[in-house]
């Protein structure tokens, strides 16, 4: 994290990242514990939604965010093809069990295993030490992240091909074979908001799988070519810089997802998320229902809740990106505040 040349800098309790910045073991513990919290939240929320589900009302007009995602990938349907929630409770309970496993892993890495992988007795573990200004170290870790993303894409593509996912065009579950047409995939960069072919959606995921697996192998196998200069990021590559780039990525994805989910009914079917939304502009963009909302989310549809929350989270993630990027570049916000009074008026006036 940025210290502005102060070797004895201290951080407040709210700066959680500062406690794991140079301790890769604790960093892994935080990752595992965070995964446990996410799994617990997903499992618990799914059970709550399932318990309150009313089959006489459209799913998109109820509190059904997690149920809608499961229905979209073909989970919860009986033999007649009707969504009854069969098997959903099992998935939710599995998430609760896994949350305990992840939480236990977080505790083990936090209190039992070494706090820094560099001190580990296992040679393979020492490769995952954190050297924020070492491009060879960072590209090695990045490569493993890309491999996991690639495997996740393969799993999704194979799930659609073997089990099948919900197709709103026929209002039923069907097996979807991916269309790996690179021309189509390239063209969908510009019209993905209106994509209406599940084959093309799966083709995009298949392409990402190959791309990410190849990128992962490349980043693991390669090292810095030539001298590590300022042009290549020397003295800029840091924990704060990487945090800022991560926030930029997740913020951008959240904003794109908001625009996509607002109107696309192929990936986000009306049967599960509610009707398409209309964009409005006030202080910032927001989306409203085009029909009367439901019984949850303050009278709004699942789609309206999903889209607006995604957009505003993305917006604030991007603000976090700008904050941490400026700090990584050496901008000291404290000096700015010291020179200004209320409402930004310079103290020298």
Curated annotation (Swiss-Prot):
- Which Gene Ontology terms of cellular component type are present? photosystem I; photosystem II; plasma membrane-derived thylakoid membrane
Q: Which cofactor does it need?
A: divinyl chlorophyll a; divinyl chlorophyll b
Gene Ontology biological process terms from the UniProt entry: photosynthetic electron transport chain
Pfam families, per database record: PSII (PF00421)
Induction info: This transcript is moderately expressed between 4.5 and 72 umol blue light/m2/s. The whole antenna complex is most highly expressed under low light; as the light levels increase antenna complex levels decrease. Thus at least in this strain the amount of antenna complex is controlled mostly at a post-transcriptional level. Transcription decreases slightly upon iron starvation.
Q: What membrane topology does this protein have? A: Multi-pass membrane protein
The superkingdom listed in its UniProt entry is Bacteria
Where is the protein situated, by its record's location annotation?
Cellular thylakoid membrane
Q: What else is known?
A: This low-light-adapted strain contains 8 pcb genes.
Q: How does it assemble?
A: The antenna complex consists of divinyl chlorophylls (a and b) and divinyl chlorophyll a/b binding proteins and binds more divinyl chlorophyll b than does the antenna complex from high-light-adapted Prochlorococcus.
Instruction: Explain the purpose of this protein.
Output: The antenna complex functions as a light receptor, it captures and delivers excitation energy to photosystems II and I. The Prochlorales pcb genes are not related to higher plant LHCs.
Family assignment? Belongs to the PsbB/PsbC family. IsiA/Pcb subfamily.
Q: What is this protein called?
A: Divinyl chlorophyll a/b light-harvesting protein PcbB
Q: Tell me what organism the protein belongs to.
A: Prochlorococcus marinus (strain SARG / CCMP1375 / SS120)
């Amino acid at each position: 994290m940025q210290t502005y040349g102060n070797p004895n800098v201290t951080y407040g309790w709210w700066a959680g990242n500062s406690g794991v910045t140079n301790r890769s073991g604790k960093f892994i513990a935080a990752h595992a514990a965070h995964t446990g919290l996410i799994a617990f939240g997903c499992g618990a929320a799914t059970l709550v939604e399932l318990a309150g589900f009313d089959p006489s009302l459209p799913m998109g007009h109820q509190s059904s965010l997690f149920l809608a995602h499961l229905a979209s990938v073909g989970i919860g349907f009986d033999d007649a093809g009707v969504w009854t929630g069969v098997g959903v409770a099992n998935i939710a309970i599995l998430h609760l069990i896994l949350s305990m496993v992840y939480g236990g892993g977080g505790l083990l890495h936090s209190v039992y295993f070494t706090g820094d992988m560099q001190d580990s007795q296992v040679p393979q573990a020492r490769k995952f030490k954190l050297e924020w200004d070492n491009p060879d170290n960072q590209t090695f870790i990045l490569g493993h992240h890309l491999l996991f993303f690639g495997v996740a894409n393969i799993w999704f593509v194979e799930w659609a091909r073997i089990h099948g996912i919900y197709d709103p065009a026929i209002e039923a579950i069907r097996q979807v074979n991916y269309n790996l047409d690179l021309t189509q995939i390239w063209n969908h960069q510009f019209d993905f908001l209106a994509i209406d072919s599940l084959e093309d959606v799966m083709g995009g995921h298949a392409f990402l799988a190959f791309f990410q697996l190849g990128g992962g192998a490349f980043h693991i196998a390669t090292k810095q070519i030539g001298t590590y200069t300022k042009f290549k990021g020397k003295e800029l590559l840091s924990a704060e810089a990487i945090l800022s780039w991560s926030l930029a990525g997740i913020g951008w994805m959240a904003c794109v997802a908001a625009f996509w989910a607002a109107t696309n009914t192929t990936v986000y079917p009306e049967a599960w998320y509610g009707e398409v939304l209309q964009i409005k502009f006030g202080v910032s963009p927001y989306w409203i229902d085009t029909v009367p909302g439901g019984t949850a989310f303050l009278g709004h549809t699942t789609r309206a809740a999903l889209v607006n929350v995604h957009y505003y989270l993305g917006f604030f993630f991007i603000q976090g990106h700008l904050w941490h990027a400026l700090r990584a570049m050496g901008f000291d916000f404290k000096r700015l505040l010291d020179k200004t009074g209320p409402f930004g008026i310079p103290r020298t006036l």
